[in-house]
Amino acid sequence: MSDTSEEKSHGATPKKLSDARKRGQIPRSSDFVRAAATCAGLGYLWLRGSVIEDKCREALLLTDKLQNLPFNLAVRQALVLLVELTLATVGPLLSALFGAVILAALLANRGFVFSLEPMKPNFDKINPFQWLKRLGSARSAVEVGKTLFKVLVLGGTFSLFFLGLWKTMVYLPVCGMGCFGVVFTGAKQLIGIGAGALLIGGLIDLLLQRALFLREMRMTKTEIKRELKEQQGTPELKGERRRIRNEMASEPPLGVHRATLVYRGTAVLIGLRYVRGETGVPILVCRAEGEAASDMFREAQNLRLKIVDDHVLAHQLMSTTKLGTAIPMQYFEPIARALLAAGLA
């Protein structure tokens, strides 16, 4: 059965998701990023609303004073006030928006993702058949549903709010500065409603995009088998790996820290391991020559190992015995005497 005729009923493996992430294929939620940025901006306006209100009130009051001043002086004062108002409101607002976009993108993408793969030319992007296929996909249906939801819910919420404030807005020119605080209070309420609605919509979109992405990344049984085969290799390769692991497991652990008796000769050091009930005969677990022998000797001293000076036996063991193997039978007697003297046998 071919891959095209099989049903993609299995979830994507971690390897497939990791490879897709390296290619820049991740669930993207632009609504969540926009909602986070908008909430940051609205939150800033909410927290700094009183300061902005005072600045705007000051600008409106200054308008009457500027009418009686010479034109050049009036323009200069108006520009100074405009710059102060911009720095006090727009500057922090842009910083909040920029920071929120970066943070929301990192949260939505679960870290920083950089890939040039999406920028490469792809014929499928301009293929009309692929476009028609995407048009009838579940993702397109979800996008249409999201658009309708935003239009109906957000539009209805804002409409109800404006209906409650329409009388205030109508009498605002007559009311003058006395209604200025009412307008800002209403604006804060509108900000709170809008921020809450946008954030909820962004979180819902984030969950939807992840669910759709995992749905698109589903695999067939054949794809899973192929991936497993690529990871583990052919049966022959797996058998060879198993054989090497078994050989390594059967070999005794080596190193001076495994030794119980050390023989030292001229520029030669031999380490043997013999533990009653564990090893039937002494095993050669370490050996060194030259500078390495000096380093190993100091390490053996630090480990408080029994050290025997025997130049002849040390050189004989060095030339006749391999690491991890038992000592030859002809050396049993002198080594047994050393073990007895050290209280190891």
Curated annotation (Swiss-Prot):
The keyword Transmembrane helix applies. It is a multi-pass membrane protein. Coiled coil: none annotated. GO terms for cellular component: plasma membrane. One of its GO terms (biological process) is protein secretion. It is found in: Cell membrane. This is Probable translocation protein y4yO. It comes from Sinorhizobium fredii (strain NBRC 101917 / NGR234).
